[in-house]
Amino acid sequence: RSAGAMGVVLEDQTWPKRCGHMRGKSVVEAEEHAAKVRAAADARDGERFIITARTDALDTDGMDEALRRALLYKEAGADVLFVEGPRSREELELIGRELPPPLAVNLVDGGNTPHFGLEELEEMGFFSVGFVVSGLYAAAAALERTYRHLLEHGSTGGLSETMMSFDEFNDMIGVE
């Protein structure tokens, strides 16, 4: 908080962490993670600081365990609950029915969780929707196209329509 953070996401994965939509994850004991959530909640100094508790147990231990963990983390002081990696509309709806709001979900392009519109997800009970790699994937595709063009043509000629101008970029980052 002293560094200006307004919140934190605490995950129950073991180290080294993997993307929640990848195989090969494992989770710590639920009570161990709940203790971390409780410590974060107890450390709040009265200022509004949002604690999001994420569980990856859906993939490792199934829905019942993921829901149990999420409820345990709520009891420990989490403000927002986040069950990572639902694989269907039915799983999303079940999470929305069984857990108290507010709820968070990640939509990873090409990942496990099917994409729905923001209104639909809100109706299912989700208030926070993370498109966590969409911008990265778009930027990577643009970089790949640009450097392939440079390799093939030796210049950026013909790319100006797909690029920001020098002035546009400086305006975007607030440099005069």
Give a label for each model feature.
Residues 1-131, 138-148:
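Alpha/beta enzyme core
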Residues 134-176:
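Extended, intrinsically disordered, low-complexity segments
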